[in-house]
Design a protein with these regions (language model features):
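Glycine-rich ATP phosphate-binding loop
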Residues: 37-61
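Activation-segment/catalytic-loop signature of the eukaryotic protein kinase fold
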Residues: 93
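Protein kinase glycine-rich loop
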Residues: 27-34, 38
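Terminal C-lobe "cap" of eukaryotic-type protein kinase domains
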Residues: 268-273, 277-293
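Activation segment signature within eukaryotic-like protein kinase domains
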Residues: 130-131
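Activation segment
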Residues: 171-173
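Conserved short submotifs of the Hanks-type protein kinase catalytic core
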Residues: 97-111, 115
Length: 350
């Protein structure tokens, strides 16, 4: 960045100087929202090596309170925990005064919406590969009991070698607490990708809502169009539950039966009837390319780590609950009840 470009609502000269001391140089702005901007950035690893990154700058002084108390802490927690080849990974997070600087992998070929706009509908074989990569990333997230809650074409990035990565975890959250599924009550995401249960305004299971949104992404890739084109929430909901959508005539005869079935299973108004991301990784449509049904070594090892992390957290919660129960018994224990508590302690220590 040069001249007046260095100073705007988000970044100041002081911010840029501090970042440069850490080896990070912000270049041109490539996206912006109400209280966040995204820049292309360079990380000078050493005198001979540098990496091109994206930097999301969040100005908390401009953000609403509910974002600061709920969404931002969740996003940071998720970003720190996740690591998967088809999810945009974070390289560094810095906080300076009221601002967060989040450095992520840069997507050389932009997002999926840009790709569709420039290149048209995606051939089925390419869709199969990209959808398999998206499902792999979401299966990993869901296995960690994390829901994305804002799946859309703009949040699928395309790398230099034309692989895809899921990005933007501003609405992501943990969806299990003490072994129980947490229903979401917040309207999240974009209208065109929102599941009917989200539009209805009732508590919903966010993992299942993610799967609906993935169905919309798949349809959009194949058709270069959305299945529902309504700006009215009421009319959109009615079309969703009545299944009023169809493939475009220009592509319908080019698609395999398995592909069309896959879309239909995902754009399913009954949330409980939608398939999971994990089950779709070996579904008939993906299996038309047999090698895609096999996880890579990295995918498999990271998934196992994610599952083990969830198990460890559950054990920690169980132990914490038991300690809390004993403490409560101690508080309540009087007279003859005290002996029972002491015996209980001994039985636990055996």
């Amino acid at each position: 960045m040069g001249g007046n470009e260095k100073v705007d609502l988000i970044t100041t000269q002081s911010d840029l100087t501090v970042l440069q001391e850490k080896g990070f140089i912000l270049e041109k702005m490539i996206g912006e929202g109400s209280y966040a901007k995204v820049y292309k950035a360079t990380h000078m690893v050493d005198e001979t090596r540098h990496a091109v990154l994206a930097c999301k700058v969040i100005d908390t002084a401009m953000a609403p309170r509910d974002y600061l108390t709920k969404f931002l802490p969740r996003e940071l927690d998720v970003l720190i925990r996740i690591n998967h080849p088809h999810i945009v990974n974070v390289s560094n997070i810095f906080q300076r005064r009221a601002k967060y600087f989040i450095f992520l992998r840069f997507a050389e070929n932009g997002d999926l919406l840009d790709f569709l706009t420039q290149n048209g509908a995606v051939p089925e074989n390419q869709c199969r590969l990209w959808m398999r990569q998206i499902l792999s990333g979401i299966h990993y997230l869901h296995s960690m009991d994390i829901a994305h809650r804002d799946m859309k074409c703009e949040n699928i990035l395309i790398t230099s070698n034309y692989n895809v990565k899921v990005t933007d975890f501003g609405f992501a959250r943990n969806v299990v607490s003490r072994g129980q599924q947490i229903l979401s009550e917040t309207y999240c995401g974009s209208l065109s990708y929102a599941a009917p249960e989200v539009l209805k305004g009732m508590p919903y299971l966010p993992k299942l809502a993610d799967m609906w949104s993935i169905g919309i992404i798949l349809y959009t890739m194949l058709n270069k169009a959305l299945p529902f084109n309504e700006t009215s929430v009421k009319k959109l909901y009615e079309k969703q539950v009545m299944r009023k959508w169809r493939f475009r005539t220009s592509v319908v005869n080019q698609l395999s039966t398995e592909c069309k079935q896959q879309v239909t299973q995902l754009i399913e108004p009954d949330a409980n009837s939608r398939p999971s991301a994990g089950s779709l990784l070996t579904a008939p449509w993906i299996a038309m390319e047999p090698k895609l049904t096999k996880m890579t070594f990295l995918e498999d090892s990271l998934l196992k780590q994610a599952i083990e992390e969830v198990k460890r957290k559950e054990l920690d919660r169980e132990e914490e609950s038991e300690v809390e129960r004993i403490a409560e018994l101690r508080r309540q224990g009087r007279g003859k009840g005290t002996q029972c508590i002491q015996n209980l302690d001994k039985s636990i220590s055996k």
